[in-house]
Amino acid sequence: MIFSEAWLKEWVDPQMSSDHLMERLTMAGLEVDGFSSVASNFKGIVVGKVITVEPHPNADKLKLCLVNDGVEDYKVVCGAPNVIPGMKVPFAKVGAEIQVRNEEVPLKIKKAKIRGEESSGMLCSAEELGLEDKSDGLLAFPDEFSLGSDVRHALELEDLSIELDLTPNRGDCLGMRGLAREVGVLTRSECKEPDFYPAQIKHKTELQIDILAQDQCPRYLGRVVKNIDLNQTSPLWLREKLRRSGLRSIDPVVDVTNYVLMELGQPMHAFDYEKLHGGIRVRMAEKNEKLILLDGKEVTLEPDILVISDHEKAVAMAGIMGGLSTSVSEKTKNVFLECAFFSPLAIAGKARTYGLHTDASHRYERGVDYELQHLAMERATEILISIVGGEAGPITETLGNLPKESSVDLLFANVKSLLGIEIPPDEIKDILTRLGFVIEKEDEDGLTVGVPTYRFDISLEADLVEELVRVYGYDNVPKTSGFFSQTLATKEPEKMVPHDRIRNSLVDLGYQEVVTYSFIDPKQSDLILVLPDAQKISLQNPISTEMSVMRSSLLPGLVDAYTHNVNRHQERVRVFESGLVFLKEEKEIKQEHRVAGLISGDRLPRNWVNEKGLSDFYDIKGDVETLIALGNSVEEFSFDNSEHPSMHPGQCAKVTTPTGVEVGFVGALHPRIGQSLGLDGSIFVFELSLDVLQNGELPRAQALSKFPEVSRDLAIVVSSEVPAAKILANVRQNAGDYLSNSRIFDVYQGDGVEKGKKSIALGLTWQHPSRTLSDDEINKIISSCVNGLHEQFNANLRD
């Protein structure tokens, strides 16, 4: 939300500097995201009055103006199309300074000759004062502005536009009234509401209002205002307040509804009364019902969308955007004003379904005070009639199922228990009362308070405690108090591999850590499957349609990060992420901690030493083995050929523990994924269970032997279908207790080896702890290994 500090001070004056105010708001949970001056840094511009306007003798588009500043007259050449005698305008006299956009040094106004005529100053547009991005003519001032007065003072431009980043639970602060109430509480300042006057009823015309969706629309108010004149323009004070709140002026009707939105936090909408047929019905959309919105976009409405309709068709998406067919135009003479309370659940996420986000939907999603509608209707009517004239009819109100007022119990002992400090009961009552809570019951142990209708976020005792400490001041809570001083660290088991150690190991291997959203595009979820029958977990209130499904794998985020980098000409990418994935099993949603990595491009960074070599399956498999080795014996884990819906056939391995628990998978991403994303080259990935990786084994200490090692090489021929890991496992099983190292150092297929078979060369090393092993002992062990390989795999020694 963006608000004007000067407008806020019309409601409440905290008697503090802007910096102090912004700090106080931030510390109370209303985070200030930024601020800016409401105008450019101009000097010496005063209110002037155009006395006469004559054609320029040497230029058709220029005019000669006589301008008075309250003291004397000045000749000024002006090219604005809207300049007329009698209007009051910003007058930059000789010596004034104007800040030109994108220029560091201001423009100093000098006396000049323009097409042969002397000009002693400049008449300014709103654009030249930094009040608008684009202006078509001079800025016209109201008649009450005093001639010669400084424009900065006349327009109260010593003001800031402050932007708040409000959390979703603080919808009550999305209007000046709620924000002023909050500032008043935080600073112990009096909040003064402007005077609101009910409109005089001048006619009896009403529209019948029927609420067919009573849970979704608990309250709907309407009023017909007749004989308005939309050739009028919104007054400068109204346009300025909207501008400083981040809204542009459109026409008097829209400006008034936007003003009430910003002042009270209540969205409103205006229909052209003559374009409505029969009456108003608030209902759910019919299947495949269509509506052309105000922006000209046609949408097909889903049955869960709440709509406003007349007796013929839908005319608005309730709480989101109006329809084009009943929109107000310059020809409109009679308007129907709508002011309603829509349930937050009825509006939440619906705008994003259609790629929309409006000020109205933003507020309705968070909750609007359901007692505010009468006040907002009267306020809008009062301002509208003061601008465009007209005659107000009676307010027509229809009720659905209004929310029930709620109460919350608060025990004083629990305040101390949760905060670690003791706030006196009288101060607790004072804070809650100033926040708008009503003390319904009290005794020596605690209170029962009634929750204000504008606070949808208060339902628990802990919510009240949060309100107390927020107003009491987080900075007033001693650092050594209660919970905040406790160290709740628990000692992890010695065999547990710390999460940070796994992350740091990947960084040491050249990976860069990324953090991606847990919400992904459904198309991504379909493209990169974890399991063929995995059920998608859709969000009821997604940020956008591209972020509407919970991730069941970390790979979509990594592929996104890879695509982002490749599109920016990064040829070598190594990224990893650790985080939660979400799996649906029957009716339950299960969370799993995982770590995943992706590599592509060169094996090593290019330089004069490293020759170009592309990453392959064995590079990423080696990285996975490094992670396993942090807490376990790599030799005991198995990498077996596997099929995976997202992986390349023949280049995917399932990783399992010695007890058969599946850790995850490693391999090449399926080529169809790269092709669908427009990516060239091979992409290698892994995804592993973080819980299994962290569950290591205690290291077994062993004394170093002082006796010599004995090494032998063994080359066998075996079927090419036999995994190398199984051969190593068989050898280790038959190689005796003193085998200290075993590895495969060569695999060969080709001349001299029968088709369908492969030659595998193993390097074996033995070492006895207390003596030297003899050749006879080693030869017997070799024979045992060869026999074991022959029996299990029909392997033979290579000639």
Feature roles, as predicted:
Residues 2, 27, 434-437, 588-590, ...:
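A carboxyl-terminal module marker
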Residues 5, 23, 63, 192-289:
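Glycine/proline-enriched, intrinsically flexible loops and inter-domain linkers
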Residues 39-43, 199-201, 486-487, 491, ...:
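Beta-rich nucleic-acid/ligand-interaction surfaces
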Residues 115-124, 128, 137-140, 152-153, ...:
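Mobile "lid/hinge" segments at catalytic clefts and subdomain interfaces of large enzymes
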Residues 178, 408-572, 712, 765-767, ...:
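Extended, well-folded interaction surfaces typified by the phenylalanyl-tRNA synthetase beta subunit core
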Residues 187-212, 388-415:
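Terminal amphipathic helices with adjacent charged low-complexity linkers/tails
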